[in-house]
A protein has these predicted regions:
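Active-site-adjacent structural elements that line small-molecule/cofactor binding pockets in enzymes
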Residues: 1-184
Length: 184
């Protein structure tokens, strides 16, 4: 895909942090950036699909564990994507002067997926370029208010963060009743 396109940004919408070592993930995304001529992006989240974790033999952990891991991972990944050599002696991850050479061609944007107002949106305000919300349209204003509050508390300009919404669409040849459409 990187070879066949020249404009499209490339990356997973949101990968569960729990599946990969964060330093290796940073190097993987950097490789994608290099082979695509600077078009990589990183979408990441705490991980949510317990059945998939079980099927892959990956520890799912508690809600708290997954968010602790995500924050530690961001403290490793972001500096590596910015051509720095981070060290971290965390509860879940340890790196020492983690190397990421060759460096990315571009400044790789980082998107955090999820809609948790206390943890996820704080991490977005602190670390991310984009927030990919996973909520109903009626919840978006409240989520944006929560994100703005985190940004204000952290001294970050909310307008620096792009917001996208992951939602469902039902495409069909015939009209459905509202109830049928909800089942899509």
């Amino acid at each position: 895909l990187a070879r066949e396109t020249s404009v499209v940004r490339l990356g997973a919408l949101v990968t569960g942090n729990t599946y990969r070592n964060p330093a290796v993930l940073a190097k993987t995304v950097t490789t994608l950036d290099i082979v695509s001529g600077g078009r990589a992006q990183l979408g990441i989240g705490a991980g949510w699909f317990e059945l998939e974790h079980d099927a892959f033999g990956v520890e799912f952990g508690t809600f708290t564990d997954r968010f602790e891991k995500l924050e530690e991972a961001l403290q490793i990944i972001l500096p590596m994507l910015r051509d720095e050599r981070p060290s971290l002696d965390g509860k879940h991850y340890q790196v020492k002067d983690a190397i990421n050479h060759p460096a990315p061609i571009s400044r790789i944007p980082v998107m955090i997926g999820g809609s948790g107002e206390k943890k996820t949106l704080r991490l977005v305000a602190q670390y991310a370029d984009e927030s990919n919300l996973t909520c109903g349209l009626d919840e978006v204003p409240r989520k944006l208010d929560a994100l703005a509050a985190h940004c204000q508390r952290l001294g970050r300009d909310r307008s620096e963060i792009t917001v996208s919404l992951q939602t469902r669409a039902c495409v069909a040849r015939k009209q459905f009743s509202r109830l049928s459409a909800r089942r899509c």
